[in-house]
């Protein structure tokens, strides 16, 4: 018999010491202790209810598991690599404490459905937490949008000045992205919150278990419908990592803008000293380390998704030892996403903006050129012809080192006789912004309404 192994009856030689260390997962799956114990208590309770094991044994099992939980949380539990994983560590300790009753706990289940349960329980709780952290960032964004309503900045395409927009409109763009990110987390929760326990190793169990009762005890919405699928797939974990990658891409784009905007060349925003660091050699430096790290950690989260996808891509049904490698990418993604969301929310809430600098930048780069084209369209000129006229006007301005607002009426009329005195009312920054009143536009009235709508939906 392989010494000290709960599965060792079939073996005549002990496990190689290095193999034991190589195959053990306790160093990282021990974080599932609470879920493992909770699942075992529910399983034991069901076994007693169904008359599969004596009620007295159930009482001993539940009491023993609660004691083990207290020991783990007090730091008094010694995890053993020789026992491989969190399941075997807890079960072995339970049997030491209560004897044969502990050996009955595993009746009607396998580690295959047990670990699937633990991961689902763990991810279910974390999905709720991640959604709460998203809400914190959404609140910070709404705060900035509301506090700075009316501030005009340049909108960019290709990182070139395009059209003037409200800073609040820009902030609310990230609000929309984060709303979708939260919705993806909530959708993932629906598919995660189903009970796999009862699937056994792959084919189910011969015991008259009550899976629906266990699902009720553990607050699951239902049970999985195919035992093979229950232990074979980790698509719920992949879905979470995919949603997290999209979320992190949004944070990375936001980070990139804050990094740019905080440079001396832009000076649109100033990040709080609390979220920046200095240089070891250049005393004048104030480095935006937090957004840079968030941008960098996006690659880490994306890598975790690829790791999970690659892990699962060629596995035959049902369980394979490869699947032990699912936990570290999942755990790391959870930790990274929560940390990034928390620090980002605090940073956004505390950042200061520079309205004058934004307005000055918005006025440069011929940002109201499209408004001139729209003006000409309203005068009866087809848009493509209007586009050509404004393009020639811009070239004239470049050649004469001037901007659109500096043109006189006479100069305007060199390009079109339909241009009149009212052109000057159409090319101010305020007029440009407020003219975009359609749903989703940057007009003040629209942005104010979207902020109010966002606050109601929190």
Swiss-Prot record:
InterPro entries registered for this protein in UniProt: Arg_succ_lyase_C, Argininosuccinate_lyase, Fumarase/histidase_N, Fumarate_lyase_CS, Fumarate_lyase_fam, Fumarate_lyase_N, L-Aspartase-like
Catalytic activity, reaction form: 2-(N(omega)-L-arginino)succinate = fumarate + L-arginine
CDD domains: Argininosuccinate_lyase
GO BP: any one term: arginine biosynthetic process via ornithine
PROSITE patterns xrefs: FUMARATE_LYASES
Pathway(s) of this molecule: Amino-acid biosynthesis; L-arginine biosynthesis; L-arginine from L-ornithine and carbamoyl phosphate: step 3/3
Database matches in Pfam families: ASL_C2, Lyase_1
Enzyme class, first EC level, given as a word: lyase
Record-given protein name: Argininosuccinate lyase
Coiled coil region boundaries: none
Protein family: Belongs to the lyase 1 family. Argininosuccinate lyase subfamily.
E.C. no: 4.3.2.1
GO annotation, cellular component aspect: cytosol
Protein localization: Cytoplasm
The UniProt record lists the keyword Lyase: yes
A GO MF label: argininosuccinate lyase activity
Keywords attached to this entry: Amino-acid biosynthesis, Arginine biosynthesis, Cytoplasm, Lyase
């Amino acid at each position: 018999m392989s010494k000290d192994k709960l599965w060792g009856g079939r073996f005549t030689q002990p496990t190689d010491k290095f193999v034991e260390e190589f195959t053990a997962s306790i160093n990282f799956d021990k974080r599932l202790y609470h879920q493992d114990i909770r699942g075992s208590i529910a399983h034991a309770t069901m076994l007693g209810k169904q008359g599969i094991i004596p009620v007295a044994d159930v009482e001993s099992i539940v009491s023993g598991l609660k004691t083990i939980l207290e020991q783990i949380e007090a730091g008094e539990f010694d995890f053993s690599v020789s026992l491989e994983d969190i399941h075997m560590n807890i079960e072995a300790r339970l049997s030491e404490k209560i004897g044969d009753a502990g050996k009955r706990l595993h009746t009607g289940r396998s580690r295959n459905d047990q670990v699937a349960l633990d991961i689902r329980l763990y991810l279910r709780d974390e999905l709720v937490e991640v959604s709460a952290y998203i809400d914190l960032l959404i609140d910070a964004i709404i705060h900035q949008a509301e506090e700075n309503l009316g501030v005009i900045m340049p909108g960019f395409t290709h990182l070139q000045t395009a059209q003037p927009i409200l800073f609040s409109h820009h902030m609310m763009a990230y609000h929309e992205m984060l709303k979708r990110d939260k919705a993806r987390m909530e959708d993932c929760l629906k598919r995660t919150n189903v009970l796999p326990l009862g699937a056994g190793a792959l084919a189910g169990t011969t015991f008259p278990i009550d899976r629906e009762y266990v699902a009720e005890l553990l607050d699951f919405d239902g049970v999985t419908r195919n035992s093979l699928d229950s232990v074979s797939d980790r698509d719920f974990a992949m879905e979470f990592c995919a949603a997290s990658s999209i979320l992190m891409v949004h944070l990375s784009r936001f980070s990139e803008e804050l990094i740019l905007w905080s440079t001396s060349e832009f000076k649109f925003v100033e990040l709080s000293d609390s979220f920046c660091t200095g240089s070891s050699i250049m005393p004048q430096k104030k480095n935006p380390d937090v957004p840079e790290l968030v941008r960098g950690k996006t690659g880490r989260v994306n890598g975790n998704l690829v790791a999970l996808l690659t892990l699962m891509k060629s596995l035959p049904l049902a369980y394979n030892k490869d699947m032990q490698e699912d936990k570290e990418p999942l755990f790391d993604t959870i930790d990274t996403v929560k940390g990034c969301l928390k620090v980002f929310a605090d940073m956004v809430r505390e950042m200061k903006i520079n309205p004058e600098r934004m307005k000055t930048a918005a006025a440069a780069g011929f940002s109201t050129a499209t408004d001139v084209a729209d003006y000409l369209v309203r005068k009866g000129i087809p848009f493509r012809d209007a586009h050509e006229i404004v393009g020639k006007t811009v070239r004239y301005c470049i050649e004469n080192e001037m901007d659109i607002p500096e043109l006189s009426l006479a100069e305007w009329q060199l390009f079109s006789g339909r241009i009149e005195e009212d052109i000057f009312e159409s090319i101010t920054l305020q007029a440009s912004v407020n003219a975009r009143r359609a749903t989703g536009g940057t007009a003040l009235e629209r942005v104010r309404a979207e902020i109010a709508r966002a606050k109601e939906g929190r």
